[in-house]
Amino acid sequence: MLEKAMMLIFMLALTGCSPEYISEAAANETVVSEAVSSNTDTQKIVFESSYDVQETGGFVTEGTETYRDFIVDSVLHSEELGDIHYCVKIPDSYDGSTPYSLYITLPGYEGLYFQGAGINIRSEEFAFEAQKYKENMIIVAPQLDDWGELSADKTIALTEFFLRNYNIDREQVYINGYSGGGETLSLVLDKRPELYTRALMCSSQWDGDYEAVTEAKIPVYFVIGESDEYYGSEPFKEAYEAIYNRYKAEGISEEEIQKLVVLDIKPASYFEDRGVTSQHGGGGLFSRDETVMGWLFGTEYSEQAEN
C-alpha cells in the first residue's frame, strides 16, 4: 500500500500539478471553453473507413472522425519517438500549388491524449480562433503525453513532417502553448527555434534555456494573469528579462527588442470583466484576445477570414 501511495505521489510530481489543482484547473478551463466557444454543437462525422498514408518521414494513420472541420486523432508513427497523435484541419482550398501558413497549438493538461482523443480541440479555442487571422492555413493540434522532453521532440517531429510533406510558407510557421503546453513550447524553442516564425506562450513558465531562441531571434510573446493561481506571473517576468537582457547585451536597439519579446501581464479585472474567476483557467480567454492573437499571426482579426 505504501509503495502504491509513493508511486501516485511520484506521478503527480511528474505532471507538476497537485490533485486539487488539476481538478480545479480542469473545471475552470471547461468554464472558459464554454464562455469563449461560439459553437457549442459537437460536429461528429464517421467516415466509411480509415486509411493509411505513407509519407516521407513517417507513416500516418488518418483519423476517422471530424469535429468542427478538424480530422480527429490522426497518428504519425515514428520509429524513434513512437505514436504522435494530433488533430488537423487542412482547408478544402489546399491543393499543394500555393504555399500555406502552418499553425501548431499545444494544449494544457486537460488536452493531453490520455484525457481522450480530440479533447484538446474540444476544451480550447485557439485552433478555431486562429482561422480568423489567416485564411490559407493548415492547423495542427498535437495531443501529447506530458510537457517534457519527449513531447517537445514529438512536436518538432510533427512540425518537420508537415514542412516536408505540404507546401508551407516557411516565413509563416506559428506556434502557441497554453499552460503545460507552454512548458513544452519552451523546450521546443530551446531545441529547434528556427522552425518557427513566432511563438505565443500563454499562462505557463519557461523550462528551456535562452541561448537558442535568442540566437535564432524568434519573436516570443508572454501573456499571463498577474496572479495566476498555478504559475504566478514571476516565471514569465524572469524569462522576459533573461531574453531582453541577452538582446540588450548584443547591442540590439530598444525598438527591435520590443519586436522580439513581449511581456503582457493581465490584471484581475481582465478576467473579472469576462466572467471568469480563475486567472489560470482564464488563460483560455487569450485565444479571443485580438491583440494577443493578432501579434502571433502579424495580422488583424477578420470575421471574413474564418473558414
Residue ranges and their predicted role:
Residues 93-98, 147-179:
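Gly/Ser-rich "nucleophile elbow"/oxyanion-hole loop immediately N-terminal to the catalytic nucleophile
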Residues 17-100, 183, 251, 255-258, ...:
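A domain-start/cap signature at the N-terminus of enzymes
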Residues 164-165, 171-215:
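Primarily recognizes the serine-hydrolase "nucleophile elbow" in alpha/beta-hydrolase
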Residues 2-20:
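Sec-dependent N-terminal signal peptides of Gram-positive bacterial secreted proteins and lipoproteins
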Residues 135, 214-220:
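Short, proline-enriched alpha-helix->beta-strand connector loops that line the catalytic pocket
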Residues 118, 231-249:
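Short alpha-helix in the alpha/beta-hydrolase fold that links the catalytic acid
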Residues 100-102, 106-156:
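Active-site machinery of serine-nucleophile hydrolases
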Residues 223, 227-229, 248-307:
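C-terminal catalytic histidine-bearing segment of alpha/beta-hydrolase fold enzymes
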